[in-house]
UniProtKB/Swiss-Prot annotation:
Record: active site: K121 (n6-amp-lysine intermediate)
SUPFAM superfamilies, alphabetized: BRCT domain, DNA ligase/mRNA capping enzyme, catalytic domain, Nucleic acid-binding proteins, RuvA domain 2-like
This protein's encoding gene: ligA
Keywords of the record: DNA damage, DNA repair, DNA replication, Ligase, Magnesium, Manganese, Metal-binding, NAD, Zinc
Residues of the BRCT domain: 595-673
Protein name (record): DNA ligase
Residue ranges the record marks as coiled coil: none
BP GO annotations: DNA repair; DNA replication
Domain of life according to the entry: Bacteria
Co-factor requirement: Mg(2+); Mn(2+)
Protein residues bound to NAD(+): D38, S39, V40, Y41, D42, S87, L88, E119, R142, E179, K296, K320
Entry EC no(s): 6.5.1.2
Length: 673
């Protein structure tokens, strides 16, 4: 039909069908008030499909028929979250919730109660939807909060996600965050059908939702009964934020975004407690799994004032439901070795279903916990999913203990490398002293060394690391920089192109910064913030390596334990040799310069939008090297917000709080100062 003009009557019918189908989706998913049976909906949809097939020039990306049809992907592309997708802090009892309320009122200097919004804590997968001029242009998973995966094609297949927002009162750019769920009924049906076909079944609806969203073939996702609910705005451009969070949810409904119906605005913490008790009693009647309630400050102005701490907002909290418990038997107690050498006892259990999840392993945390609880092999124990998530052994039922129950001792030798295991007096954790020559520690150390916040070696994932160690291609972290193309291509599923890409990423990682290098070394207690602090203080690696414990303790934010760990690390011969070898192999960084009367020193900066001359990480590192602090969220403690192209909601929050806004040119001038 190419080149043939579409009759006006047909064009009008196509537009009418699209409008009707979108309206019925809105009534079904947003209002929960369907007005036609499924059979009639299917007839409308099939009529539209036939017309679009006959007149393909009428097809638009936002047509309801275009949810499925993309080619299978080879890989999910990474997506950087301009505003981090942070998780929430948790409380598990009334005392914890009251403490949260008290902290907020003290911070705001308020004696009287104020408004909270309470909503069920959905047990699904966090998802970010980006709409430009009302059209869905990107969907991304949370990932680590800073970088997620592009799952746009899969998300388009979820019928409750509008491809085009309703009405015309939407902003130029808006990021809608929410949760993807698989309802219980759909989950049960999916598993029944999978079982009949002999296919893999899922342990619980959350795993099913996650697995469905991460299918490389969107046609598979399209067959899964997924639903999306919105609960938050991230980026916003071309429209001012409303006053309250509940107004945001009203926007969502108006735009055709489903919002969970069991949301309530309450006055003060007593109302939150009442809401919690109500949901504890009614949770099983809900169509999908929830694992607690979420409490948010209703006022967006107050949210901006409260800001964030570490990886969570101060203005919201998750109040988790009581843990669910079951009995099972301990078949064995084995030992796992972590990156820092910590030897952790793990209980191997007779599989038992707890809150819909099959639990066969549970951590015993450390040997002090193991002996305090007196858990033995052969014991009948109570297993709990704390917060419906982490399997934990609560303790043994002594009345059921068999005579041959076996008490486990701390191993004298590492189960992986057979080096000595020591447990210093007063410490709960036993450690393998094998260091980076222990295969288990080596594996975890290499994964850490290559991670995004460390040397950022793209493509060096868990399975590849394990394979390199297994094939003895890497014997310590310096082995990364001695890999040969011929050795890589000889491995299963590693072709020429894959090997070239990996070697390019490894070569690129040689140029780094001192804070990243220090973090990559995996020193106990040294996260990326402490690494930046050390780099700012010493400027040179040699000076840090020679520093005494007393010198280290004089640095702000470095406590006695961290000082001892840092000192011990650099005074171990093996570690010093590895560092020298890495430098000899080409790992390098610009020297950290001492800060002299910088206008940036002591100031806190937040970036929003894209800068032309610098990447976000380059800008943050320049701020840190100049003695300033770069954070990811705006609060009343922020001194400057640097505004690049297409700024997000941080810009609006900064304006609301009266924080200094500077453009890229002004920021570069500050750097030169």
């Amino acid at each position: 039909m190419n080149g043939v003009e579409v009759p006006a009557k047909i064009q009008k019918r196509i537009e009418r069908l699209r409008q009707e189908i979108n309206d019925h989706n809105y009534r079904y998913y947003v209002l929960s008030q369907p007005t036609i049976p499924d059979s009639v909906y299917d007839e409308l949809f099939h009529e539209l499909e036939k017309l679009e097939k006959k007149y393909p020039e009428t097809i638009t990306p936002s047509s309801p028929t275009q949810r499925v049809g993309a080619e299978p992907l080879k890989v999910f592309e990474p997506v950087h979250h301009e505003i981090p997708m942070l998780s929430l802090d948790n409380v598990f009892d009334e005392k914890g919730l009251r403490a949260f309320d008290k902290r907020i009122r003290q911070r705001l200097k308020l004696d009287k109660p104020f408004e909270y919004v309470c909503e069920p804590k959905m047990d699904g997968v966090a998802l970010s939807l980006l709409y430009e001029n009302g059209e869905l242009i990107r969907a991304a998973t949370r990932g680590d909060g800073y970088t997620g995966e592009n799952v746009t094609q899969n998300t388009r297949t979820i019928a409750s996600v509008p491809l085009q927002l309703r009405g015309n009162d939407y902003p130029e750019l808006v990021e809608i965050r929410g949760e993807v769920l698989m309802p219980r009924e759909g989950f049960a049906k999916f598993n029944r059908e999978a079982e009949k076909r002999g296919d893999k079944t899922f342990a619980n609806p959350r795993n099913a939702a996650s697995g469905s969203l991460r299918q490389l073939d969107p046609r598979i996702t399209a067959k899964r009964p997924l639903i999306f609910y919105g609960y938050l705005i991230g980026l916003l451009k071309g429209k001012d934020f409303p006053k309250n969070h509940c107004d945001v949810l009203k926007w969502f409904k108006d735009w055709g975004i489903p919002v969970i119906s069991e949301i309530k605005v309450v006055g003060g913490i007593e109302g939150c407690l009442d809401y919690y008790e109500h949901l504890v009693k009614t949770r099983e009647k809900m169509p999908f799994d929830i694992d607690g309630i979420v409490i948010k400050v209703n006022s967006l102005q107050v949210q901006a004032e409260l800001g964030f701490v570490s990886r969570a907002p101060r203005w919201a909290i998750a109040y988790k439901f009581p843990a669910q418990e079951k009995m099972t038997v301990v078949k064995a107690i084995e030992f796992q070795v972590g990156r820092t050498g910590a030897v952790t006892p793990v209980a191997r259990l007779e599989p038992v279903s707890v809150s819909g999840v099959t639990v066969s392993n549970a951590t015993l945390h450390n040997f002090d916990e193991l002996y305090r609880k007196d858990v033995r092999v052969g014991d009948t124990v109570i297993v709990r999913r704390a917060g419906d998530v982490i399997p934990e052994v609560v303790g043994p039922i002594l009345a059921k203990r068999p005579k041959k129950a076996k008490l486990i001792k701390i191993p004298s030798r590492c189960p992986v490398c057979h080096a000595e295991v020591i447990k210093p007096e007063g410490e709960a954790v036993a450690r393998c002293v094998g260091g980076l020559y222990c295969r288990a520690q080596l594996r975890e150390s290499i994964k850490h060394f290559a991670s995004r916040r460390a040397l950022d070696i793209e493509g060096l994932g868990d399975k590849l690391v394990e394979l390199f160690i297994q094939e003895k291609l890497i014997k310590d972290i310096t082995g990364i920089y001695q890999l040969k193309k011929s050795a890589i291509t000889a491995l299963p599923r590693m072709g020429e192109k894959s090997a070239e890409n990996l070697l390019t990423a490894i070569e690129k990682s040689k140029k780094t910064t001192l804070p990243r290098f220090l973090y990559a070394l995996g020193i106990r207690g040294v996260g990326d913030t402490t690494a930046r602090t050390l780099a700012r203080h010493f400027h040179e690696l040699d000076l840090l390596m020679k520093a005494s414990i007393e010198t280290l303790q004089e640095i702000r934010d470095i406590g006695p334990v961290a000082a001892e760990n840092i000192h011990a690390f650099f005074h171990q011969k093996n570690n010093a040799e590895l560092i020298n070898k890495l430098i000899h192999l080409g790992v390098h960084w610009p020297q950290e310069k001492a800060v002299v009367k910088s206008e940036i020193a002591g100031k806190t900066f937040v970036l929003t939008g894209a800068l032309k001359s610098l990447t976000r990480e380059e800008a943050e590192e320049k701020i840190e090297r100049s003695g300033g602090k770069a954070t990811s969220s705006v609060s009343k403690n922020t001194d400057y917000v640097i505004v690049g192209e297409n700024p997000g909601s941080k810009y609006e929050k900064a304006k609301a709080l009266g924080i200094s806004l500077i453009d890229e040119e002004a920021f570069l001038k500050l750097l030169k100062s």
